Amino acid sequence: MVTPDGYLHRSSKSFNESMNIQPIIDLDQELLLKINGSDSLFWDGFMWIATNMLTWIPLAVVLLYVIFKNNKVKEALLIIGMLALVITLTDQIASGFCKPFFARFRPTQDPELMYQIDIVNGYRGGIYGFVSSHAANTFGIAIFLSLIIRSWSLGIMLFSWACINAYSRMYLGVHYPGDIFCGTLIGLGIGTLIYMLYTYIRKKFIHSPNYISNQYTSTGYLNSDISIILFVFILTIYYILIGSMIKIQTSLF
């Protein structure tokens, strides 16, 4: 059946039965219903702000600043180019291929489940949700930059950021845990492959020394610059928390 958006839609029931994955689908739905929503205006506000990519623009700007500050222009441009490739590939695989190919409804669009889902601000997302492009993008960025910069503290921060974004998608009811899990695998895989491509190009065309110092990471990034990134991340979390509390106050009047 072709839906109004032009996608070929397969019957989810017949597809699931033919692939013998109905038990997995049932478990996915059960997990989603446990994660989705709450009676808390605070958490509604937190997840709503956290899932918005515009919230994280200051963090992205500081990351770009640190990359250019700690590398020669040629290598910085190579890193940015590879990062753009990570984002493009993860997004195209998730949204351009997987969503129309598998045609799995988002929980908020699934006729069998949509009225059991708690939604925030009327947001339901697009028709299909497998796999999550948010998860693919954020985990792809997290693994790529973690391998590039080689800082444990930054790696923990980047994966925390990716996890917050991924969890917010389930909380808002626009993705099943399975959507997130598969999107995460795609992101980690693409991020790692592009890092391998980056190291090949870097060794062939750019010579950069390894650093052994308590002031630098092993790839030459000042630890003080890493601290700036962490500080901006913490400020962003505070911004989300304050925004969540403001949502509570405004809802009372």
Where are these regions (language model features)?
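Transmembrane helix interruption/hinge and helix-loop junction motifs
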Residues: M53-L54, K72-V73, I149-S153
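Membrane-embedded catalytic cores of phosphoryl/pyrophosphoryl-handling enzymes
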Residues: D118-L252
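Alpha-helical membrane-inserting segments
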Residues: L63, L89-C98, I190-R202
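Interfacial segments of alpha-helical transmembrane regions
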Residues: Y65-I93, L154-I156
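Hydrophobic alpha-helical transmembrane segments
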Residues: A50-I67, G81, H134-N137, M157
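N-terminal transmembrane-helix/juxtamembrane module of multi-pass inner/ER membrane proteins
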Residues: Y7, S12-P58, A94-R124, I246-F253
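N-terminal signal-anchor transmembrane alpha helix
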Residues: N20, G81-F101, I234-L241
